Regions:
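Conserved, structured core segments of small domains
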Residues: 2-121
């Protein structure tokens, strides 16, 4: 996998853990409205790939290379929860700007990561 290809747009993961969202009870509706508005803007701009939230009511399952299945995720890794959005953007600066918009809407910091370039995916 190539780390970056400047000739094509990169996909960026914008995410947050559930614990990052400290929202007073009366503000949840506004947060949802604002977050959906930013996602709608990303869709209208043609940069939205997909997104969602981890269903914390369904426990993870670890499937080994030999096909063995075990309840729970990696024992040494922190639990994966919260929400995420994947956007396809022409620059890191634009990714930072979208992450800032999402952070403002969600009322919490967002982690920004870039996917490595794989010409076969």
């Amino acid at each position: 996998m190539v780390r970056h290809n400047k000739n094509i747009m990169a996909k960026y993961l914008i995410s947050f853990p559930s614990a990052a969202m400290v929202v007073p009870d009366g503000e949840w509706e506004a947060v949802g409205r604002d977050a959906h508005a930013v996602i709608d803007e990303a869709k209208a701009a043609g940069v939205y790939v997909f997104g969602g939230g981890i269903d914390e009511g369904v426990p993870p399952v670890l499937v080994s290379a030999d096909g063995a299945v075990a309840e729970g995720g990696y024992p040494w890794a922190p639990p994966l929860d919260g929400g995420f959005t994947v956007l396809e953007l022409p620059s890191h600066d634009e990714a930072v700007a979208w992450a800032a918009r999402i952070a403002k809407a969600c009322r919490c910091a967002q982690e920004l990561r870039v996917f490595g370039f794989d010409p076969q995916s």
